[in-house]
Amino acid sequence: EAYNKDNNIYVRDVAEDKEYVLSRDGIKDFYYSGEMAWSPDSKKLAVIKVRDIPERRIPLIESSPVSQKQPILQWRDYAKPGDVLPVYLPALFNIEQKQQIPLDTRFFENQFYLQLTGWREDSRAFMFEFNQRGHQRYIVAEVDAETGGIRSLIDEQSPTFVYYNRNFRYDLEDGKEILWISERDGWRHLYLIDGN
C-alpha cells in the first residue's frame, strides 16, 4: 500500500504492518501527489511530484442572478497567459531498496501538463504524456524502471496547435507497436508507430 503523508510518499508492508518512508524532500509547495501507479510486479512505484503555485484569483460578476436582483461577486482561480503554471514531475521509487531512482527533469521544461499513463506489462518501464506549454508539442515517453532513463516514443509537433484533448493512443503487444492519431499532415490519420 502506498500513500501521500506530510507531502512525501510512504509505503506500508501490509503483511508486516510496517510503514516506510520513500521520499523525504516533499514540502508544502513541492509535494508528492496522490497520482501514483504500481508496477505490475509491485517492485517499483511511479508518482507525480507537483511544484504548486499560489492561487491567482480574478473577480467575476454575475450580473443577473436568478436568486436575487442584485449582482453577485464571485472569485475564480484563473491562470492568465504568461502566468507561472504548476509543474508536474514524474518520480520513480524502488520499493525493495526503499530509494528513489533519479530522473532527468530537463525533459519536462516549459510544460502545460504531464500525466502518468501506466506501466508496461513486464514492469520494464512506465509511460507518461507531456503537453508543452503553447500546445505545439506533445510527447509520449517511457521511463526505464531500472535506470530512470527517459525515451521519447512519440514527439508530436505543430507550428500551430496539437489537439491534445483529442489524442488517441493504444499500445499493442506491450508497447512493441503503438496506434496513434495525429493531424501532423493537416488531416486526422491513424498511425502505427514502432515502440522499439
What are these regions (language model features)?
Residues 3, 12-15, 48, 55-61, ...:
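Short, solvent-exposed loop/turn and secondary-structure capping segments
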Residues 1-2, 27-45, 74-82, 86-89, ...:
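Conserved beta-propeller blade repeats
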Residues 7, 89-97, 147, 184:
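Glycine-rich, acidic and aromatic/proline-enriched surface loops and short helix-turn segments
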